[in-house]
């Protein structure tokens, strides 16, 4: 029997078409039976006649300990990548590099201090790779490359529904706004500050008209968007635009069971005062309207429709004041 098959050894177990991380629970030198416990709870008995490199093999030390950059893994296969992400996720390390690519795992909870002003300041003073993986490291590298390469930069954020693309976009804009305000050692002009605020604070209104509850995500973006920022030679944000595309128009008239129409309709009914409701002939709650209740879901405990209405109106009033 191979020397690495000792009690407590970390191995890969091939189960049908997939590899599972497992631990050697015990091994019998008499009949050669190997008892493995997969990380997901399954107990597997492997006979001596079944032992071969394709069935069970040792886990590389880099996979046992986990790495910040998966390009340095000693074994590159799907199971090793997923296992490394899971190891870091269990320690609230939701960011992992893959070379110059950043992989983010949505923790579905708040992680204290992960995006604090102190963290923003820390990443603004270091190059990519000098600190642990973080979305601020990507944003900082993008900002630095504007001046280092004298060329436009692009950050592509992609992932499945609920992966955290919308929140990641907000964090990128937050970091770039801070860098803009601190650039050149001089305070930004009033016009520059207004531009930054308009871009960053546009999120509530974009989400209200373009996001909806789906079975996978309670705040799912049902459209794509391209955000373009223009920087001055001094490093300040001078202007920008948001282009939306591929809006899921059919959601307005039909939703799948358990899903909702766009947030704006529910927030309007929840937050508008009596005069505004009467002006638009809105005399009932969302359950009374077919296009808002046909899916059987008009309310979700994780969504505050009244608060969203307040945020949208606050943004709209602030925008009117600026213009």
For each predicted feature, which ranges?
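N-terminal switch/interaction subdomains of large nucleotide-dependent motors and GTPases
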Residues: 4-6, 21-31, 36-323
């Amino acid at each position: 029997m191979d020397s690495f098959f000792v009690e407590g050894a970390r191995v890969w177990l091939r189960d049908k078409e997939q590899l599972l991380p497992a631990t050697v629970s015990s091994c019998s030198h008499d009949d050669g039976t190997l008892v493995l416990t997969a990380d997901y709870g399954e107990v597997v008995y492997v006979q001596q006649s079944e032992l071969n490199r394709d069935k069970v093999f040792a886990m590389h030390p880099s996979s046992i300990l986990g790495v910040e950059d998966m390009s340095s893994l000693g074994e590159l296969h799907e199971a090793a990548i997923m296992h490394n992400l899971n190891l870091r996720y269990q320690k609230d390390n939701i960011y992992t590099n893959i070379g110059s690519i950043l992989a983010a795992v949505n923790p579905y909870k708040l992680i204290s201090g992960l995006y604090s002003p102190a963290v923003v300041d820390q990443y603004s003073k270091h190059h990519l790779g000098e600190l642990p993986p973080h979305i601020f490291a990507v944003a900082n590298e993008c900002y630095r490359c504007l001046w280092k390469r004298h060329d436009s930069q692009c950050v592509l954020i992609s992932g499945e529904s609920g992966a955290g693309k919308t929140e990641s976009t907000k964090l990128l804009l937050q970091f770039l706004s801070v860098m803009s305000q601190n650039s050149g050692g001089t305070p930004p002009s009033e016009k520059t500050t207004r531009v930054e605020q308009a871009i960053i604070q546009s999120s509530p209104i974009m989400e209200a008209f373009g996001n909806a509850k789906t079975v996978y995500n309670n705040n799912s973006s049902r459209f794509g968007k391209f955000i373009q920022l223009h920087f001055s030679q001094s490093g300040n944000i001078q202007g920008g635009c948001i282009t939306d595309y591929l809006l899921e128009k059919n959601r307005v008239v039909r939703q799948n069971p358990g899903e909702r129409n766009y947030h704006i309709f529910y927030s309007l009914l929840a937050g508008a005062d009596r005069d505004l409701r009467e002006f638009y002939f809105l005399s009932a709650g969302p359950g009374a309207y077919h296009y808002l209740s046909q899916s059987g879901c008009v309310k979700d405990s994780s969504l505050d429709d009244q608060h969203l209405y307040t945020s949208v109106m606050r943004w709209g009033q602030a925008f009117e004041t600026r213009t």
